[in-house]
Amino acid sequence: DYSEGAHPSVLEAISEHNFETTCGYSMDPFCRHTADTVRELTDCPDADVHFIVGGTLANTIVISAALRPWEGVIAATTGHINVHETGAIESSGHKVCAIEATDGKLTPALVRKVMRIHCDGKDEHMVLPRMVYISDATELGTIYTKAELAALYEVCREYDLYLFLDGARLPAALVAQGNDLDITDFGKYCDAFYIGGTKNGLLFGEALVITNDSLKPHFRNMIKQRGGMFAKGFLFGVQFDAYFKDGLWLDMARHAVTQAQRIAKAAQEKGYTLYAQSPTNQVFVVLSHEKIAELEKNFAFEAFGHVDDDHEAMRFVCSWATKPEAVDALIE
């Protein structure tokens, strides 16, 4: 879902404002306007809004800013920060306290288990968990319900933990069948979260929303120190303004999810097993080595997990730009 450029409306907006002279580092009128749009959209009038180029950088900056040197972050073993960020969090000096989670989703019971392992944060010889990291959708394409998110928020309050939500694929989660979360719910139940754009039709960009006042001071200093202070920041504002206009961001996500679910439905009808029950724009299909070799001649997809000596789980991802006829060809 980051394999194409950007939606034509986004490119048109960039072209329209290309020769305008603005302040750098997201201090321009476009970013200020779009930040206000995000506050209104999320019903977080007092939130700080920052724009970051991509997900790994956003995760690293938020976690680095929130944690003291002896503190760590709880995540599922399949969590992006644990397996797909090349140790970015650890390189900043913070341990990822990973735990096995069904369908990639953390629960209050799992958080409590990690806290017990770490002596509820009372042993100075151990890392002190201080944050819970989740993503919606998860790495397995699964989504959280409102009740699940609220329950995680409550256990985080119980243990004085921050709850941080990676929203790189949040648009896809919001339009997925079975979702009961509204964009306004994340401001209620998360200390920080972001709305992904890179994987949903922007050239680049994640809109980070910080609701917890304790995380706000000097956050731009951390952005700069971690290499995230984008000089041509006005491009964030211009892109996201087009993104949110007339619900384009959700329309793009719906297209991606619709095409992906066509693949999921067809795979099951043809007798294939799904590795994970994902209602989003990611589909995980268990395939034989022979079928993988056959499909690789004409299609691009990714190995996701080993199943047995003869089968692997393969990940197929659709985007805002996936052509229905391409899905037809894969199904055939």
Residue ranges and their predicted role:
Residues 102, 128-130, 135-138, 143, ...:
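Active-site C-terminal subdomain of aminotransferase-like
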Residues 7-54, 77-82, 88:
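Conserved N-terminal alpha-helix of the aminotransferase class I/II PLP-enzyme fold
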Residues 73, 96-97, 163-165, 274, ...:
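Hydrophobic beta-strand scaffold residues
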Residues 93-139, 144-151:
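PLP-dependent aminotransferase-class I/II
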Residues 65-83, 112:
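Conserved PLP-anchoring active-site segment centered on the Schiff-base-forming lysine
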Residues 69-70, 261-331:
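Conserved C-terminal alpha-helix-loop-beta "cap" of PLP-dependent enzymes
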Residues 144-176:
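Catalytic PLP-binding core of fold-type I/II PLP enzymes
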